[in-house]
Design a protein with these regions (language model features):
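Structural core segment of the AMP-binding/adenylate-forming
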Residues: 12-13, 58, 85-163, 544, ...
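Conserved pre-ATP/AMP-binding loop-to-beta segment of ANL
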Residues: 21-24, 139-140, 161-190, 197, ...
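Conserved AMP-binding/adenylate-forming core of the ANL superfamily
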Residues: 26-73, 77-81, 98-103, 156-165, ...
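Conserved AMP-binding A3 loop
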Residues: 38-41, 186-212
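Conserved structural elements of the adenylate-forming
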Residues: 49-50, 182, 201-222, 230, ...
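Conserved AMP-binding/adenylation subdomain of ANL enzymes
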Residues: 209-226, 233-336, 350
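Conserved ATP-binding/catalytic segment of the ANL
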Residues: 406-473, 490
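Conserved C-terminal "lid"/linker of ANL adenylate-forming enzymes
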Residues: 471, 496-499, 505, 542, ...
Length: 604
C-alpha cells in the first residue's frame, strides 16, 4: 500500500484538503459538551491557516517556540499544524503537569506563547507566568475559563483566531511553506522520566517524514478508517499514530478525557486505536469476569468460541499458516455470532488495527485480544525514535511475546548488557540544551543507547526490561519487574503493583487492590472492616490475594516468584511523584515512600 500523500508537515493538512475536500476529517466534542461534532478537511485546512496567520500577527517568528498545555482537543491540532506552517516549534506538555514542571519546560524551551486547555491549566500557567522571562502570552482553548483579574497576557483562542480570520499574512505564510526544511525542528518532547530527570527530545520534520513512510509500509490504515484517540497528543506514540492516520485520509475522533474512552468507543464505533497494555488488561478482566458470572451454557459457548479464535488466529494465522477449511468455516460462524457480540460491547463492530506499546504486554492478554478477532499490533518505540522501532507485521508470522520486526528505516544492534542500540532517520539528534548527555547517548558508530535490554531471534525483537529497572537479588539472580507485574495485573482484584527485589533475598510486592471488588469479596465472606486500612491489614484478604498470585506466577522460575506482599490502602499517584505523566511507576520514589513497609516484609 502506497502512502496516498507525501507532504512536509507544514502543508500536510492543506494537501489532504485538496484531495478530500468536504469529507469529514475530525470528530470531537467541545469543552463541556456531550455532543459529537465534525470538521471537514477544508475546514481543518482553513483553521490551520488562520492559526499560522494569527501567530504571525502576535509576533511569532520562524524557529520560535510555542507550547500546548491541554487535554486532547480539536484546537490542539489546529495549533500544532498552524505552528508547523510558519516554521515554529511546538512543545507539548502533559495536561496533568505540575506548576514546577511547566515552569521548567517553558524556561528550558524558551517558550514565547503558551496555549492552555481548561481552568486547571490556565491557573497553573498564570501562577508561573512571572517566573518565565520568555513567556509573552497565554492563549486559552476553553472559552468558559475564568481569566484572572488584570491578566493582560491572557487571550481566548476564539479571539486569537480572529487575528488570522481573513488570512491577512497568507502571502508570508506561503513563502514560509516554500522554505520549509526537513532539518527544521517540529517538536521538543519532554520525557516524563521514571527517574525524574526530564529531558527535551528534539524531533525534526525529517524524522516525521521517515517515520510516516516506514510505518505506512506495515500499518494498514486507510481513508475508510475511523481512528479514536485514547492517549494524549503529548505522548509520541499517539502523536506519531495520529499524524500517520491523518496522512492516510482517515477520520480522527478526538477523545478529550481518557476515563470516557469506553463510552466514546460505544458512541462512535472506531475501527482503530492506539493504546497502552493496561487498556487491554482491563478489557480482558472485564470480559472474563462477565463470562465467569454468566450461566453455564453461555459460559461454555464463550470459552469454546475463544478456543476456536485462538486456534485460527494464533496457531495458524500468527504462525503464517493457512487454517484448514473446517476451522475457517467454524470460525466464520463463531465470529459472526459470539465473538462479534463481545466486540460490540466494546464499540468495536468493525475492528481493523490496534497498535499497543508503552509497557510490557502480557502474552495472556495478547492471546485473548487476538482470539476475539481484534488486530492488536504489539510494538516497541521511544520518544527518541519518534515512536515505532519495531512492531508485529500482521502479514508475516509473529511470536506472541515479541515486539515484532524492526520497521524498514531502523538498524538494531545489541550492545553490552544486551542493550538495544538504534540507528536510522527516525532517531533524534539528541536532547535540547544537553550537550554533555548527548555525547554519552550515542556510541562510537552513532547508535543511540536506548537503556532497554533485549534480544533478536528469527528477525523479531524481544524486550527484557529497562536496564536500570533490572533487579539483582542478594543471591545474584536477575529479576525483570515489569514482566512479573504484568502477570499480576490481569487479576481482577489487583489495580496497581510494584515489585521489590533489588539487593533483597527474595521477591516481594506492594499491591494496591481493586477496592470495589475486594470490598465486595470481604462482605461475601463476612469480614468486618471500617476502612481501607482495615481491609489491607486483614489476613484473610492477604491470603486470598497471595493464593491468586501463586496461581498467576506458576510459569515463573522459583527465584522470580513473589513470596510476600503488602497491601496499600491508597493508589500510587502523580501528585506523590510515584507515577510519571504516562502512569509508569517511579521505583526510586516508591522505594523511598514505602521504605518501612518494604523493610517489614524482609524481617525474619
Amino acid at each position: 500500500m502506497l502512502m496516498q500523500v507525501k507532504s512536509h508537515l507544514s502543508v500536510l493538512i492543506h494537501d489532504l484538503a485538496n484531495k478530500y475536500g468536504d469529507k469529514t476529517a475530525l470528530t470531537f466534542k467541545k469543552f463541556g459538551s456531550d455532543k459529537w461534532q465534525s470538521v471537514s478537511w477544508n475546514q481543518f485546512s482553513l483553521r490551520v491557516k488562520q492559526v499560522s496567520n494569527a501567530l504571525l500577527n502576535i509576533g511569532a517568528k520562524p524557529h520560535d517556540k510555542i507550547a500546548v498545555f491541554s487535554q486532547n482537543c480539536v484546537h490542539y491540532l489546529y495549533t500544532d499544524f498552524g505552528a508547523y506552517g510558519i516554521k515554529v516549534c511546538s512543545i507539548p506538555f502533559y495536561a496533568t503537569s505540575s506548576e514546577q514542571q511547566i515552569q521548567y519546560m517553558i524556561n528550558d524551551g524558551q517558550v514565547r506563547f503558551l496555549f492552555v486547555g481548561e481552568q486547571d491549566q490556565y491557573d497553573k500557567a498564570h501562577r508561573v507566568f512571572a517566573l518565565c522571562p520568555s513567556l509573552e502570552r497565554i492563549i486559552i482553548f476553553d472559552s468558559s475559563v475564568r481569566i484572572s483579574t488584570h491578566d493582560p497576557a491572557a487571550l481566548y483562542f476564539k479571539d486569537f483566531i480572529k487575528l488570522g480570520e481573513n488570512l491577512p499574512r497568507q502571502t508570508e505564510v506561503e513563502a514560509l511553506y516554500q522554505s520549509a526544511s526537513m532539518d527544521d525542528m517540529a517538536n521538543i518532547l519532554y520525557t516524563s522520566g521514571t527517574t525524574g530527570d526530564s529531558k527535551g527530545v528534539m524531533l525534526t520534520y525529517g524524522q516525521y517524514d521517515a517515520a510516516l513512510r516506514a510505518n505506512d509500509e506495515v500499518v494498514p490504515v486507510s481513508e475508510k478508517d475511523r481512528v479514536i484517540n485514547f492517549l494524549p497528543f503529548t505522548h509520541i506514540f499517539e502523536r506519531g499514530w495520529a499524524y500517520l492516520c491523518l496522512s492516510e485520509g482517515a477520520q480522527l475522533i478526538i477523545n478529550t478525557y481518557p476515563h470516557e474512552i469506553q463510552e466514546s468507543m460505544r458512541q462512535v464505533h472506531p475501527t482503530c486505536m492506539s493504546s497502552v497494555p493496561r487498556f487491554w488488561e482491563k478489557v480482558y478482566i472485564a470480559v472474563k469476569a462477565r463470562m465467569d458470572e454468566a450461566g453455564s451454557v453461555q459460559k461454555k459457548l464463550f470459552y469454546h468460541a475463544l478456543a476456536v479464535g485462538r486456534k485460527r488466529n494464533i496457531e495458524y494465522i500468527a504462525n503464517g499458516k493457512r487454517p484448514p477449511l473446517t476451522l475457517e468455516l467454524e470460525y466464520k460462524i463463531i465470529n459472526k455470532t459470539i465473538l462479534s457480540m463481545v466486540r460490540k460491547q466494546l464499540g468495536l463492530e468493525h475492528p481493523n488495527i490496534f497498535p499497543t506499546a508503552g509497557a510490557y504486554v502480557s502474552p495472556e492478554v495478547e492471546e485473548f485480544v487476538l482470539s476475539i478477532g481484534i488486530g492488536m499490533v504489539v510494538g516497541y518505540g521511544l520518544t527518541e525514535s519518534l515512536a515505532t522501532v519495531s512492531c508485529v507485521h500482521l502479514d508475516k508470522k509473529f511470536t506472541i511475546g515479541s515486539v515484532g520486526r524492526p520497521i524498514s528505516s531502523i538498524q538494531i544492534k545489541i550492545g553490552e548488557d544486551n542493550e538495544i542500540l538504534l540507528k536510522g532517520p527516525t532517531i533524534t539528534k539528541g536532547y535540547y540544551h544537553r550537550d554533555t548527555t548527548n555525547a554519552k547517548v550515542f556510541d562510537e558508530e552513532g547508535f543511540f543507547r536506548t537503556g532497554d535490554a533485549g534480544y533478536m531471534k528469527d528477525g523479531e525483537l524481544f524486550l527484557t526490561e529497562r536496564i536500570k529497572d533490572l533487579f539483582k537479588t542478594s543471591n545474584g539472580k536477575y529479576i525483570a519487574p515489569q514482566q512479573v507485574e504484568s502477570l499480576l495485573l490481569v487479576d481482577k482484584f489487583i489495580d496497581q503493583v510494584a515489585v521489590i527485589a533489588d539487593q533483597r533475598k527474595f521477591v516481594s510486592a506492594l499491591i494496591v487492590p481493586e477496592f470495589r471488588l475486594v470490598e465486595d469479596w470481604a462482605r461475601e465472606h463476612h469480614i468486618a472492616f471500617s476502612s481501607r486500612e482495615d481491609l489491607c491489614a486483614n489476613e484473610q484478604v492477604k491470603k486470598m490475594l497471595q493464593e491468586r498470585i501463586n496461581t498467576l506466577q506458576q510459569q515463573l522460575a522459583y527465584y522470580e516468584q513473589i513470596k510476600r506482599i503488602t497491601l496499600l490502602p491508597h493508589h500510587f499517584s502523580m501528585e506523590s511523584g510515584e507515577l510519571t505523566n504516562t502512569l509508569k511507576i517511579r521505583r526510586p520514589i516508591i522505594n523511598k515512600n514505602y521504605q518501612a513497609e518494604i523493610d517489614k516484609m524482609y524481617e525474619e
